[in-house]
């Protein structure tokens, strides 16, 4: 298909396997084939390599691996966009093993959009208790109220939901509707960076655009759900952040990072997480059988949660 990709102007992108800088010429609109050629110059491996059947070699390996190693998860047994949405929001900041039971409990009480929309916010928060990052629950509730009982069916509409970003929208649309949108999360960054040997920082503007384009190029458009689920599982199980299983990796023979001995160095992040210490001093007040608590009104991640009287200080 002859679609176009808007390309950023006069940027310098660094290749893991070239000492020289690759100058990105100034384009306003560049045909996709030209962009693929640029990806080829950045990556050690030709991103367009295909099998005899015309399928991308990388994508085929990911899908074949997934068919043999996929994790059995309850939200994968349905193409219901509502259930997929709930699972993706839960997994934004929660490990799969921890989120499993919470997902089942949540959908048992709120099995569809309307039941969630009709619920009281305090009840929604109660069923979210233990997952943390409670703004996710508030966003779910607000988004459900905006749907009028029907989950949206287009990518722009899904993306417009409160609390839904590009990754979540791509996951929902590919898993529920079979739409060709590539997911890009931490697992995808890691797999693509290592396999293609790209050391452009994943948290830079250039890196985000580059990896989004590379992910889109690798996407199997005939099986987007299978491929997206596959590459995420591959990153979570096979190509892990620490101690990846390179010995039994189906991509080992053509992995740039492995051949260069740089698996532990990729992907690259340019900014380290800044940690700020906060000190909460809670006051326990009890009168007979009653304990004093109040609802937190501050506009932060704990908004509308109940807590003991609090004094926050800058030192311990």
Task: Please give the residue ranges for each predicted region.
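Polybasic, lysine-rich low-complexity intrinsically disordered segments
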Residues: 11-13, 18-22, 31, 45-46, ...
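Catalytic cores of DNA base-excision repair glycosylases
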Residues: 56-61, 65-245, 251-260, 264
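Intrinsically disordered, low-complexity segments enriched in small/polar residues
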Residues: 2, 12, 41, 63-64, ...
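Ser/Thr/Pro/Gly-rich low-complexity, intrinsically disordered segments
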Residues: 2-3, 23-26, 48
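Intrinsic-disorder-associated, low-complexity terminal segments enriched in Asp/Asn/His/Tyr and depleted
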Residues: 2-4, 14-17, 40, 52
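Leucine-biased recognition of intrinsically disordered, low-complexity hydrophobic segments
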Residues: 25-28, 37-39
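Intrinsically disordered, low-complexity, charged terminal extensions of DNA damage-control enzymes
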Residues: 33-34, 40-71, 77, 236-316
């Amino acid at each position: 298909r002859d679609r176009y990709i808007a390309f950023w102007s006069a940027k310098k992108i660094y290749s893991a396997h070239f000492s020289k800088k690759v100058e990105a010429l100034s384009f306003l609109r560049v045909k996709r084939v030209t962009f693929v050629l640029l990806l080829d110059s950045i990556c050690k491996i030709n991103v367009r390599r295909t099998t005899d059947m015309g399928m991308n070699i990388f994508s085929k390996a990911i899908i074949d691996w997934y068919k043999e190693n996929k994790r059995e998860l309850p939200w994968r047994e349905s193409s219901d966009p509502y259930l997929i949405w709930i699972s993706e929001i839960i997994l934004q900041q929660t490990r799969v093993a921890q989120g499993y039971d919470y997902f089942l409990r949540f959908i048992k009480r709120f099995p569809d959009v309307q039941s969630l929309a009709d619920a009281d916010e305090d009840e929604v928060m109660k069923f979210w208790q233990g997952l943390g990052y409670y703004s996710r629950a508030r966003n779910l509730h607000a988004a459900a109220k905006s749907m009028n009982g029907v989950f949206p069916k287009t990518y722009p509409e899904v993306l417009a939901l409160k609390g839904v970003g590009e990754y979540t929208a791509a996951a929902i649309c590919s898993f529920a509707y079979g739409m060709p949108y590539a997911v890009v999360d931490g697992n995808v960054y890691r797999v693509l960076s290592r396999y293609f040997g790209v050391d452009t920082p994943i948290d830079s503007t250039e890196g985000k655009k580059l990896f989004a384009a590379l992910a889109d190029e690798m996407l199997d458009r005939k099986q987007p759900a299978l491929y997206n689920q596959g590459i995420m599982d591959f990153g979570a199980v096979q190509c892990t952040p620490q101690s990846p299983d390179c010995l039994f990796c189906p991509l080992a023979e053509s992995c740039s990072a492995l051949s260069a001995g740089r698996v532990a160095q990729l992907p690259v992040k340019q900014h380290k997480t800044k940690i700020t210490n906060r000190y909460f001093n809670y006051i326990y007040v009890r009168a007979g059988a009653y304990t004093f608590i109040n609802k937190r009104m501050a506009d932060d991640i704990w908004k509308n949660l109940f807590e003991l009287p609090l004094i926050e200080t800058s030192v311990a």
